[in-house]
Amino acid sequence: KLGYCVFSPNFNGLKLLPNFAYTGDIRVSAKAVSGFVDRVLTATGSKKVDLIGWSQGGGPLPNYYITKLGGDKKVSKLIALAPSNHGVGPRAVSRFVNESISEAKHKKIEATFAKAHIASYEQQLGFSNFNKELYGNGPVTRPGVKYTVIEGRYDDVVVPFTNAFLDEPGVKNILVQDPCRDDHASHVNFTYDVNVYQMAVNALDPDHAQPVTCVFQPFIG
């Protein structure tokens, strides 16, 4: 409808439910996405792609690809919807856990999640070694990539909701309630929220951005 070629791959999911995607190690998922982006660039003849992702798909997964796997050379824009950037738990809890448990216990926690092929759930906790590796060593953004983070204050997974935002150069952080104060979208609601959709479309083509028409949505607000 808008003239974009849209690709939506599912990788690294549960072995018995492969369409339940991206539950495995985020590093492995990022490598799969890297290969897929290369295929898209070859098929379309484009030099770069725009990435739109929700939750893990807007936060640690694409950011790992961009910062660790050379994605900054192939990504023009990253539009992140309710991304789990700084963890899905309060920072105070993460700080307490970091100060309270040993590295050996950290490793044991990682191994337990990895064995069940749900490593990404542990990796998105604010106190995880993965989160510290990715976000704890200076800026995660890269020159040449335009970042937009769209988050709402009623997110019930990324808590507090400010964990989603990146306070770094080149990032536009948008709070849904600034233009649409009566939008009560939860974390899952972001995947079909009409107001969020409008903001994402504007981020894709900022030169032709349109005013957001706030829509009241039953069961969301």
Residue ranges and their predicted role:
Residues 1-12:
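Short, surface-exposed "cap/lid" segments of acyl-processing enzymes
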Residues 4, 47, 73-76, 145, ...:
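A structural micro-motif
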Residues 16-32:
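Catalytic nucleophile-loop/oxyanion-hole region of alpha/beta-hydrolase
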Residues 100, 140-221:
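C-terminal catalytic-base region of ester-bond hydrolases, centering on the histidine
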